[in-house]
Design a protein with these regions (language model features):
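Mixed-charge, glycine-accented linear interaction segment located at domain edges/termini
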Residues: 9, 132-137, 147-148
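Oligomerization/assembly interface segments of phage tail-like spikes and tubes
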Residues: 50-75, 123-137, 238
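Short beta-strand and beta-hairpin "edge-sheet" elements
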Residues: 95-137
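Intrinsically disordered, low-complexity segments enriched in serine, threonine, and glycine
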Residues: 139-258
């Protein structure tokens, strides 16, 4: 599944926990990343290709084998305290970040569903961990902050290899008074610009373009202060025009299929 034996799970590096990934594959080639699996079914209304319909993505569980290691990558015997410590780290209530040192720019979101202990009589062995991915994608994170006091523009590249529009999260800080009108427009795609106004001086709002929500740092709903024309990013380069006295932090997690 992953080539490197080192990884980060839920913000903690495997070295800190004294564990590593192992594989039992004897071949030179091993599986890498997540499998892509999408079902296609036949519409009963017809028999040619135009009558095939796409089902939802089939998200397959993955298995990772985790061994306890000492200095020099020497496998160690487990004890009950260590088992509890490691399983407590691996079992989470929600999907959490997984980053393999194969490529630290790729983030996966996984949730542990099963742990099986494979030990001999000396408790030497490994944990077989089954995890459910959030999706069939890895994600490339992007975050950049811009400050404008005059109309200006910037370029952002949607690096996803999916043919879908991406809707980012915008953190907007109003640097003017309540009369300041903030406009954000993607000139690369058709559609109206996103407009928000009536914010207090230095008020910060988070705009989730996918969920269609606008909240300030007091968790107050400010949806009524925008026109609900959410920013969308096309694949590849996008030129974004901005007007108003504003600080914008644009945050993306572009999905990629490997």
């Amino acid at each position: 599944m992953f080539v490197s034996d080192k990884f980060i799970f839920n913000g903690i590096h495997s070295d800190e926990m004294g564990v590593a990934l192992i594989t039992f594959d004897s071949n030179v080639l091993n599986k890498y990343g997540l499998n892509f699996n999408r079902g296609i079914s036949l519409d009963k209304g017809g028999g040619d290709m135009s009558h095939f319909v796409q089902d939802g993505d089939n998200i397959e569980e993955i298995e990772l084998n985790i061994v306890l290691i000492g200095s020099g990558f020497t496998p160690m015997a487990w004890d009950d305290e260590t088992i509890m410590h490691i399983t407590s780290w691996l079992i989470t209530d929600s999907f959490v970040e997984f980053i393999s040192e194969d490529n630290i720019d790729l983030t996966y979101y996984l949730k542990t569903t099963k742990i099986v202990k494979h030990f001999n009589h000396n408790k030497e062995g490994y944990l077989q961990v089954t995890l459910q991915p959030f999706s069939n994608c890895a994600y490339i994170k992007y975050s950049k902050k811009y400050t404008f006091d005059n109309p200006n523009s910037f370029t952002i590249k949607n690096v996803s290899n999916l043919n879908e529009m991406y809707k980012p999260i915008l953190q907007i800080k109003n640097l003017g008074d309540a009369s300041n009108i903030i406009t954000i427009e993607n000139t690369t795609v058709e559609g109206e610009p996103f407009v928000i106004e009536g914010l207090d001086l230095n008020e910060v709002v988070q705009v989730d373009s996918l969920l269609g929500t606008v909240y300030n740092d007091k968790n107050e709903n400010l949806l009524m202060k925008c026109n609900r024309k959410w920013l969308k990013l096309a694949k590849n380069e996008n030129v974004i025009n901005v007007s108003g006295n504003v600080e914008i932090d644009i945050k993306c997690q572009f999905p990629v299929i490997l």
